[in-house]
Amino acid sequence: MTARGKNVKIQTLATENEIFLYDRRYVSEQDNADLPKLPSPQPLVLDKPPDTLSDRNDLQAWRNLYAARKTWAAELTERCEMADTSIRELNERTGIVNRAASVALENLKTHVAALENRFQEAQAWAKELSREQKSALEEWKRALANLENIPARKEFSFLGRPSTPKKDADRATGTLLDYVDAVEVQKAGPEASAASSRFAQQIQDIERAVGEITAGTQRLLDDVPNSRTDTADGLLQEIEPLSRKIQSDYEHVLGLSNNSKTLANISRLALNHTQDILPSMLEIAMEIRESLAAAVRQYDAATKSALGRTKLISAIQSRLADVQAHIANLTFQSDAFDLLYSVFHMPLVYGSVLIESVRRHEFNEKMKSDSLTLAEELSIFQDEEQRRRKKWVKNMEDFLSVTDTTTPGIEVNLRGHEFDWPIVTRKDIETYIEDLRSNPGTANAAQELAQAFKELDAPTRVQRRRAKAFKQGSIFDLSRSSLLLHSDEIVRSLRDEKLKLEEKLRGSESRIRKLEDLLHRHSHLGRPSSGNFSIDFPASPASPHPDPMSRRSSVSSRRLSSNQTSEEKNLVNRIVHLEADLAIERETVQRLQREADAERQSNTNKMQEAQSTKNDLIGNLEARQREFSDERRYLEGEVKRFKIRVEELEEELDRLTDSRDHEKQDADERMHQLELELQDAHARADAEMRKANNLLEQMQSHREAADRSKLRMDELEKQATERTQKDQEVRHALQAAFMNLSPGGSVPDEIVDIIKAIDVLSEGLTIHAKTAEDNAMKAAAENKTLIEQLEKMESNYENAKSASEQYQTQLTQAREEVEQEQSKVKAIESELNDERASLLELESKLAAGETGAGALREHVAEEEQKLNNMSQQLAETEARARRSEEEALQWRKRAEALSESDKQVAARIDIRTARLEELSRQLFGQVEKLERMLEQLGFTVIRQDGEIVVQRSSKVNALSATADTLSQSGVVSVKPDPSLLNWMQGEHPEEETERFNAFLESLHQFSVDIFGDAVVKRVKDIEVLARKWQKEARGYRDKYHRMQSEAHDKIAYRSFKEGDLALFLPTRNQAIRSWAAFNVGAPHYFLREQDVHKLQARDWLLARITKIEERVVDLSKSMNGGNPDRRSIGEASDGASIDDENPFELSDGLRWYLLDATEEKPGAPATPGLGKSTVAPAHVDAKGSIRLKRTPAGGNVTKTLTRSLDSRRNSSASASIKRGTPPSRANDSTTDLVRPAQAESESIAAATDSKSQSQSQSQERERRQEAQGTAVIFDEVRRDQLQGP
């Protein structure tokens, strides 16, 4: 904001000396962010002054003490200066914070003042509306009851009727209540009351909110913090002299010699330092430290106070915006009140319908009668033409072969009368109005309807214009007005004309009385100056012939003179001649007296006219001054109101600008977030693609692992079945061995029982040991082989054990372990076969009777050992078989889990594939939208020399104008290919990878950074251009308003157009009474005379142009059409009769303009003297310089105006206008007075005809200069009239 509490504008930013910035994060009511704390100033540390003295009698010790004190004082002074600087900065910041809060409060005051003004306007409107509503709520029942008492006809079906039928519905007449739904009105009463209460409550809420805002603002104004700040300037000025004193004392001590007196002085000086100077410096430093702490506290307090005040201001402004929005949207609409108002308006509406029915019925009748009359007249014309054609054809039938005697005719038809309104008479309207007048509640409606009823007889504008048969002497207008003008219209028009003539008569009578009064007052000027003048010169006119009595006396004397002498005869003759001379002299004297009386009367009239003109001009100027002063006061009030409105609009514009800036900032942030999201989406898409590839690889590896697991499970099942078979074979072998040892015995079920039974049988075989000695060697050899086999079996067992352990760790070695087990089983089978063979051999030997108990025992022990080993091997083999089964079961479960996981992974991959497709489509769509946005902004994205470039479309078109340039520069469109969306539909992984890489490459081709830079640059260019255009538009608008306001009240003198203010003056052509616009180089702008102008009583007319018609004179039409009747000037009331093609008698081919104008300031006083004729007084002024001697004070105004008018006529008159037409319509008295002067001027003009051509040219130049001078004078008079005295 500025220091005046106004929002800073970009246009005036360079002219502002200081501005105040506010952070919304801290001043907003919703945000509770902590204020950033500034670093605290370094505190002022105070040290004790040095007071250590090693030797009181040593001068150097004293010098060292003084040096230490000087250093301490200098450091203390420096720290105090830094503290003073900190105090100044803190005080300055405190003042800025306080001023910022005051500026914000001033801005709030402006807004609150505007709000109060708007609320006062809204409150006034609401009070008026509430008053109307209250009146309607109080009177609607009575108005509804009045409707029931007012009779009305039921024929108007288009008026609103109730939804339910009523009694006596078949009657033709009823009441106005029949046109109102009483039930709905009864329901609308409570609803309207409730709506009015709600509206009143809404107004009260707004008033309460405005009051709270005003009270809050007033509290802020009352709670203004104290802005007084303390400085340490005086303290710093006190401590500096003390520091300089210590320094000067140190320098003084350095220059002293070492003696007892010097030491005493030094000691005394040091004591002064210790007691006075050093404590004073410490006290001042402590005060400065306290001032620094106080400045810090004051700054903190001011910051907190300003923060709280700005938050309150922000809260008030937010509420103020809401209240302003509520006031702006404050409206009231209620159907219930509309129903109630219809009850009040129904009498007036019904009366208007009655009047409209009469008007339409009369118009229809008039149209029918006029159409019949028109058809009859046209048929008469057609019959006459038909007879003329027949007659002509009959005369020319010998030379022609024309047989068509038909004459074109016109058929008149009426249309648009499908809907007939009910027939209403004027008597019905008068009766209805009387009914309303008798009802006390409808008097106003009756008065309005009575006025509307009177307007039925008022003629329309066209009828008033057609009522005048001769409009500027045109017979064509008479023919037009004769049609569609019947007796009723004639009566009305004649009545209007009668009223106008009566008004004119009253005006003429008042003017005549005024002239008689002037003549009576100035009649003494016409009497002779001497009382005996009439004795010498009788009043009766003298005649050159003597009267009959004198003639008879002279005859009788001549008869008697015959007796007289010659001398007497001579005397008689002399007397006769003297009488004749006396008669001639008397006639001459009487003529001179009449001329003097006429000249005196003329001068008197001129003086009266001049005085009247002056009084009229003075009155006109005073009236204009009053009007101008009133208008000036009104305009000043309007200017103030508009200034307030402009400030409000500027504030509103600033708020809108701020909101737009915030929206722009939010949009930038959203764009940045979208860019980040797009980048994240790209990254997620890449990660998803990598995950998808990894998942595909994992699926492939899982599939391979599953296949391997299945194969291994098959192998394990095979191993388990083989082991089971091996166990069965071992069981069968042991059973066979038992059966061999005991052929008739029963074989036990378990292997251990079999082994025990074999042991028992082996003990029985010891009896036959002696028989087996011969076979001992063989048995020993067999024993050795069996031991070797057992060792092999043990080694095989260990190998199998290690193989099983490796099988648990590595599944790949399962097949080898199974093969080893198979080899072991084969070895055991071979061993069992060998044992079986040996047992058979022993049985055969026993059967043969061989003995050898010892060898047999050994052999049996060996066999038992073998059997134990074999049983252990079998137990181990069974354990391995069980473990193998368990492992097989675990691997089966693992295989099932892998298959389930495989299915889940497949389903998840399918879902992710669909999501990837949707993501790819969305990315593709976003890229297309961004490219389309660039195209709409006028950009084109192209690839040029391997780089992405955003250019204007015009540049790209210019670049692609020729194929050679396109091929050389490498400009290629970057629009993505839609077929790349199917990258996941590849038949092979390599093809899918290639498509995916192409898709990523197409996406990477569109750079978001370049897009953002282009859009931001484009937006900035648009903003700059918009600001420029807005500034220019404001300038042009202000210039237009200024020029319009200046030109509205100025008189135009060239380039006339509609709406201009023009000064119209009469031309010299008195025969046609033409008026033209005052102009400079723009002639032939003539005024269309209207009755309201009253040009007969005016010398000038100030009017505003409403219409301009451009015309060209074409005399060929008038010559071909025949010469119209020309009436004499004395016979025609409006001057000579003229033709519409050339009403002002201009030359052929001349372009002229006919202006319609309305008087700008009607009611200007008329001038009685100059209003009669504007040319004759000009002639009097022009010729009066020859014979008459006028006083300069009596006729300055009239002379100036007449000279201006004369120059205006000379400048505006066309070359084709006839200047020789004598002014026939002039004031009779003025014309009589001017005739002698005209005769004398004609004689003088005849005498001056012999002047040279150079003299006439000089006179022409003088006339031009005089015309220019009069134009300047007239401009000054006009400017004085406009500005006021």
UniProtKB/Swiss-Prot annotation:
Transmembrane annotation, as ranges: none
Classification via Pfam families: ATG11, ATG17_like
Keywords, ordered alphabetically: Autophagy, Coiled coil, Membrane, Protein transport, Transport, Vacuole
GO BP: autophagosome assembly; autophagy of mitochondrion; pexophagy; piecemeal microautophagy of the nucleus; protein transport; reticulophagy; ribophagy
GO cellular component, one term: Atg1/ULK1 kinase complex
Record field: compositional bias (Polar residues): 601-615, 1197-1215
Biased composition (Low complexity): 551-562
Disulphide bridges: none
Region: Disordered, residue numbers: 32-52, 523-568, 595-615, 1116-1142, 1181-1285
Gene Ontology terms, MF aspect: molecular adaptor activity; protein kinase binding
Compositional bias segments (type: Basic and acidic residues): 1275-1285
Family the entry assigns: Belongs to the ATG11 family.
General function of this protein: Involved in cytoplasm to vacuole transport (Cvt), pexophagy, mitophagy and nucleophagy. Recruits mitochondria for their selective degradation via autophagy (mitophagy) during starvation. Works as scaffold proteins that recruit ATG proteins to the pre-autophagosome (PAS), the site of vesicle/autophagosome formation. Required for the Cvt vesicles completion.
Protein name per UniProt: Autophagy-related protein 11
Originating organism: Emericella nidulans (strain FGSC A4 / ATCC 38163 / CBS 112.46 / NRRL 194 / M139) (Aspergillus nidulans)
Gene responsible for this protein: atg11
